[in-house]
């Protein structure tokens, strides 16, 4: 991997003398800049606009070249607000793409799209930087082995397993436990895999970004006392940012993740919240760049933009980037071009259910709606596959019987159906699990359950060996031995 050392001050001053242009036109976040003949910047070069506005305030706006228009004119997209810019202002061509800090110094810190810290905790070590525009790893570098990425979360590992180096779509409304699930995954990858995480907040609410940061500090994912011990780097380009920043913040987060994979040879979790906002920002910029809109008003380059981001998220022989992407579906229309283009890249989907959350079953992952391409006998093995299928069949039958139970009651069911319902209710409760990051809220210690233990537990429930245990014994426990111990305690309390 190529690492760009930070440009020294003397180099910048010579650049200023060499490649100076002037603003010719400003259309919102898009600028047209005129350069001297033969001094045209390359596509994706970073341009810097320095000057003062009408009230004397210092202006420092970074732009990215998107088009070469001819007649020594380029069109660039601003990464911050263009307020106060005027025609004729000087523009410096830096001669390189946007570069951001990478490595251990980024952990525990919050950055903007330009890689500048925005958490008021002082400067970041910028000796190691990397450009945000890079090619996807060459085919020969890819790790072609299909392997499961064990999360320690029972419902995920059993029914919708994640692929190491894969892409997972996370679907769920507000208040169903998306943030807590994300934090638990960050915690578990650090403890079980010695990996780190990068969180890219793309075009979402600033309040949510702040809440996530506060909760991460509270749960220990970000270590305030020793920042270097933190397990995650945060990159935010929120709703109030111009479209240029929202369009590129995903690449900034990805660049930081690539360094951990390629240089530190670690397993990395990359969270993107929300991938739809990445498309939306591209759509806003596309119209301003004069491109003809495509279906439903989206940019004609939608598939290319999505592909250039997604293809960089992969496993190599050094390490892996496993990406979990929150997907907003506009008007719940799955055929909308934005979510439809995203689905083409996903290996698994994790769907959070409000119904399960209302029952108090956390994580509220819907076992019937969540899917994974990894759940095949040749990948996970016959035992895992058979157990998962039987669990799904039992839950599906319970779902079909719920209307009858609501109208006529349990007594009207056949003996076989009553047994199915009893086991399904135990399975439903056993799919819940106490989280490490929720210890501060619940008071019960978190549990990491290995895949073999998970399969053994569900096999025992399905076989009927535990039919005599009360269903509350299976609620919020780790492995099956804890459920049997809890049942004995409940029995003792009754006496």
From Swiss-Prot:
Keywords: ATP synthesis, ATP-binding, CF(1), Chloroplast, Hydrogen ion transport, Ion transport, Membrane, Nucleotide-binding, Plastid, Thylakoid, Translocase, Transport
InterPro entries (UniProt xref): AAA+_ATPase, ATP-synt_VA_C, ATP_synth_F1_bsu, ATPase_a/bsu_AS, ATPase_alpha/beta_chains, ATPase_F1/V1/A1_a/bsu_N, ATPase_F1/V1/A1_a/bsu_N_sf, ATPase_F1/V1/A1_a/bsu_nucl-bd
Membrane topology: Peripheral membrane protein
GO molecular function: ATP binding; ATP hydrolysis activity; proton-transporting ATP synthase activity, rotational mechanism
Domain of life: Eukaryota
E.C. numbers: 7.1.2.2
Biological process terms in GO annotation: proton motive force-driven mitochondrial ATP synthesis
Reaction catalyzed: ATP + H2O + 4 H(+)(in) = ADP + phosphate + 5 H(+)(out)
Coiled-coil ranges from the UniProt annotation: none
Predominant location: plastid
Keyword Nucleotide-binding: yes
A Pfam family reported for this protein in Swiss-Prot or TrEMBL: ATP-synt_ab
Binding-site positions, ATP: 172-179
Record's GO cellular component terms: chloroplast thylakoid membrane; mitochondrion; proton-transporting ATP synthase complex
Compartments, record wording: Plastid, Chloroplast thylakoid membrane
PROSITE patterns: ATPASE_ALPHA_BETA (PS00152)
Family as reported in the entry's similarity comment: Belongs to the ATPase alpha/beta chains family.
Subunit details: F-type ATPases have 2 components, CF(1) - the catalytic core - and CF(0) - the membrane proton channel. CF(1) has five subunits: alpha(3), beta(3), gamma(1), delta(1), epsilon(1). CF(0) has four main subunits: a(1), b(1), b'(1) and c(9-12).
Function: Produces ATP from ADP in the presence of a proton gradient across the membrane. The catalytic sites are hosted primarily by the beta subunits.
NCBIfam families documented for this protein: atpD
Stated name of the protein: ATP synthase subunit beta, chloroplastic
Organism of this sequence: Hyacinthoides non-scripta (English bluebell)
Taxonomic lineage: Eukaryota, Viridiplantae, Streptophyta, Embryophyta, Tracheophyta
Name of the encoding gene: atpB
